[in-house]
Design a protein with these regions (language model features):
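A juxtamembrane structural motif centered on a specific transmembrane helix
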Residues: 1, 5, 327-378
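Transmembrane helices with small-residue packing motifs
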Residues: 32-33
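Transmembrane helix boundary and interhelical junction motifs in multipass membrane proteins
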Residues: 163-168, 254-259, 269-271, 288, ...
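Short clusters of hydrophobic/aromatic residues that line enzyme substrate/ligand-binding pockets
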Residues: 103, 112, 137, 251-252, ...
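TM-adjacent membrane-interface loops and short helices in multi-pass inner/ER membrane proteins
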Residues: 224-271, 285-286
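Hydrophobic alpha-helical transmembrane segments of multi-pass inner membrane proteins, especially
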Residues: 16-20, 28, 38-235, 276-337, ...
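N-terminal membrane topogenic signal
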Residues: 2-15, 70
Length: 378
């Protein structure tokens, strides 16, 4: 009987490959800093390995639980996400690099990032909401309800944890899920044009203000994006070092472990900027290979979403697909200076325990949906 059901080994293999590759690149990118700071070249890699193992165990457990089990916790997840975000402002809050975005879990040594919890819970909540609203999601009222639901969470993530990139991802997930549930192109064309117009206006204002920006952090980042050389010792330093890494890698790269920029030149080499180290050590070939792996991952999710047994399963997979796609695109765009630096990790590859745990939980949900697909439906 079980053989009549589908299990996506291709999806599982791609995820395992990205995790394994990520561990190799984290070791390569962080070994110098880790040895200099902690006396152990594999310090960051070991911590990530532990997070990956815990995440994989969680993924397997979630994959074997019927995904409808989680629907009853959708509203609870929304509330818990909000509470966790506010806990950042309590003594439990952990600061790093000038931002307080983590909660310290007592007696564990683990720091939890509430924004990662919010992304997963928002996918669950919106998938449940789409099913409850039914055809009314296609009305203008339904559209505003769906787009308004994630706004409080996204606003709190931005205002309380100062995490613009996660707020953008949460709203991006909502836009994609609403679009799939209600493919009314006019609303989304208008929304897209409005966002582009607002972004263009913001860039114009930054260009006109010039040196008057002063201490306004976000606007200063946009100015550094437009002309990183003018702030080579300040906001533009990380971007320039990342571009040097990408440019020096050429087509085939310098070779694994041969990066120069990781030698304390490039800040956050093992985290937000790990793609630039991939480009430096493995060249354009390595960068394209990783992008193709992400495309294959998204394609497998699209196949699962198209064949999901019901709407809730399909919307879960669409939400996870949107999360990974948006985050990967934003990370690569930041590293290549296509958009202003927002501080965002590369899924499955960058260093970060919270990100790995909750991304693997999302993959568990996708595999759970895939397991309920009957082979005769494919």
């Amino acid at each position: 009987q079980q053989s009549e059901y589908f299990f996506d080994y291709s999806l599982l293999f791609i995820v395992l490959f990205l995790l394994g590759f990520g561990l190799i690149m984290i070791y390569s990118a962080s070994s110098y800093e880790a040895y200099d700071t902690y006396g152990d070249a594999a310090f960051y890699m070991k911590k990530q390995l532990v997070a990956n193992i815990i995440g994989l165990v969680g993924m397997i457990i979630i994959a074997n639980i019927p995904y409808h089990f989680w629907e009853r916790f959708a509203m609870l997840g929304y509330v818990v996400s909000m509470i966790l975000i506010f806990l950042v402002k309590t003594p439990l809050g952990i600061s790093s690099h000038g931002a307080t975005r983590w909660i310290g879990i007592p007696h564990t040594g683990f720091n939890l990032q509430p924004a990662e919890v919010a992304k997963l819970c928002m996918i669950l909540f919106l998938a449940s909401l789409v099913c409850k609203m039914g055809k009314s999601v296609r009305t203008m009222k339904g559209f505003f309800i769906m787009m308004g639901a994630p706004l409080p969470i996204a606003a709190c993530v931005y205002l309380i944890t100062d995490n613009l990139s996660s707020a953008i991802i949460i709203m991006g997930i909502a836009v994609l899920m609403v679009f799939v549930a209600s493919p009314d192109y006019k609303k989304f064309v208008i929304m897209g044009l409005s966002v582009v117009a607002a972004a263009a206006l913001l860039v114009f204002v930054v260009v006109q203000l010039g040196d008057k920006i002063g201490g306004k952090f976000r606007l200063a980042r946009i100015q550094a994006w437009l002309n990183p050389e003018s702030q080579a010792q300040d906001k533009g330093f990380q971007t320039l070092q990342a571009l040097y890494a990408i440019g020096s890698g050429g087509i085939w790269g310098k070779g694994l472990g041969q990066s120069m920029q990781k030698l304390s030149f490039l800040p956050e080499a093992q985290n937000d900027m790990i793609f630039s180290i991939i480009c430096e050590e493995l060249g354009l070939f390595g960068a394209v290979a990783i992008i193709l792996m992400f495309i294959m991952l998204l394609w497998r999710m699209m196949v699962i979403a198209n064949n999901a047994p019901d709407l809730f399963g399909a919307m879960l997979v669409v939400g996870v697909m949107g999360h990974i796609a948006i985050q990967a695109i934003l990370n690569i765009a930041v590293v290549t200076n296509s958009i202003p630096n927002t501080g965002i990790s590369l899924p499955f590859i960058s260093y970060g325990g919270s990100s790995a745990l909750f991304l693997l939980a999302e993959i568990g949900l996708v595999l759970s949906v895939a397991r309920r697909i009957q082979l005769k439906e494919l």
